[in-house]
């Protein structure tokens, strides 16, 4: 089997074509990452005018800080809830629209609405609905004797930010899952039905394995979303409270850097978060992708 390679008249043309992307990557990714790594090894005054090299002291201080360790485990718990819940709920709705619900066009449009809402607005929307005194949902819960106050209950606060974050991401996941389900050849589904396989068995034995590549892609995307893009939700909904119950690493970095003006500690936390995401992504590609079959 022969393969052809593109031939350019100028040897500089390939480099010129990739130059814009390389410039963007260097300016907005590599350079900031390098700056964060450099500042994490320094002791910097609050205004950033002077610094002193301290090596790994900032990292040693971090991992002896109980508040930071709490934020670390809160991030793991929060990102797991958001990623798993977001994927399962989106897949459930995509399967409903594809196989069960009539008038799917209306439901497709309805499912896309959260994508048009900014994360902070999504948080404010659910704050109104879960308002302890006047919220519609809290009034409904009170009818069953359940007292809701996420400003004082850490479990309820975590549920609120997870719920708002998942709701915001449902549309994105739904689009990919629905497109993947539509791409499955109907002949496979019909053949399984003729053989006596029910809807549930057809879904788990045929549809789910065939959409595994899309599921893996969304797993990586949702994990990154949970680590970084949920900051506006947490900031608007709980501000990391109560008692830091919803303070994730990204929110603690913001507090340390912009409120506490501790640039060195904030940079060290950024480096730890960056390496954590890199490790999780590598693990996913190494062990999860190996079980995905691309057709």
Swiss-Prot record:
Domain of life: Bacteria
A Gene Ontology BP annotation from the UniProt entry: transmembrane transport
UniProt topological domain (Cytoplasmic) ranges: 1-11, 102-109, 178-207, 284-295
Topological domains annotated Periplasmic: 33-80, 131-156, 229-262
Transmembrane segments: 12-32, 81-101, 110-130, 157-177, 208-228, 263-283
Chief location: membrane
Bilayer topology: Multi-pass membrane protein
Alphabetical UniProt keywords: Cell inner membrane, Cell membrane, Membrane, Transmembrane, Transmembrane helix, Transport
Domain ABC transmembrane type-1 residue range list: 76-284
Family: Belongs to the binding-protein-dependent transport system permease family. UgpAE subfamily.
Oligomeric form and interacting partners: The complex is composed of two ATP-binding proteins (UgpC), two transmembrane proteins (UgpA and UgpE) and a solute-binding protein (UgpB).
UniProt protein name: sn-glycerol-3-phosphate transport system permease protein UgpA
Source organism per UniProt: Escherichia coli O6:K15:H31 (strain 536 / UPEC)
């Amino acid at each position: 089997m022969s393969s052809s390679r593109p031939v350019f008249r100028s040897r500089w043309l390939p480099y010129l074509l990739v130059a814009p992307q390389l410039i963007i990557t260097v300016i907005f990714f590599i350079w900031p990452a390098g700056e964060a790594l450099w500042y994490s090894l320094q002791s910097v005054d609050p205004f950033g005018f002077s610094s002193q090299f301290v090596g790994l002291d900032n990292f040693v201080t971090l991992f002896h800080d109980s508040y930071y360790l709490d934020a670390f485990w809160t991030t793991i718990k929060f990102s797991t809830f958001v990623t798993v819940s977001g994927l399962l709920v989106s897949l459930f709705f995509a399967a409903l629209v594809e196989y069960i619900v009539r008038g799917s066009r209306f439901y497709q449009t309805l499912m896309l609405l959260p994508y048009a809402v900014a994360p902070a607005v999504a948080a404010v929307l659910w704050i109104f609905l879960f308002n302890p005194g006047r919220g519609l949902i809290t009034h409904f819960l009170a009818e069953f004797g359940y007292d809701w106050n996420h400003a004082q209950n850490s479990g309820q606060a975590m549920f609120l930010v997870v719920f708002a974050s998942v709701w915001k991401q449902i549309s994105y996941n739904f689009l990919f899952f629905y497109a993947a389900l539509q791409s499955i050849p109907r002949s496979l589904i019909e053949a399984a039905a003729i053989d006596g396989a029910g809807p549930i068995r057809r879904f788990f034995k045929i549809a789910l394995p065939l959409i595994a590549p899309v599921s893996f892609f969304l797993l990586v995307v949702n994990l990154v979303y949970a680590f970084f893009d949920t900051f506006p939700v947490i900031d608007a909904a709980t501000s990391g409270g109560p008692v830091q119950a919803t303070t994730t690493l990204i929110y603690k970095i913001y507090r340390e850097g912009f409120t506490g003006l501790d640039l060195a500690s904030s940079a060290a936390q950024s480096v730890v978060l960056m390496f954590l995401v890199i490790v999780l992504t590598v693990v996913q590609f190494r062990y999860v992708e190996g079980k995905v079959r691309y057709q």
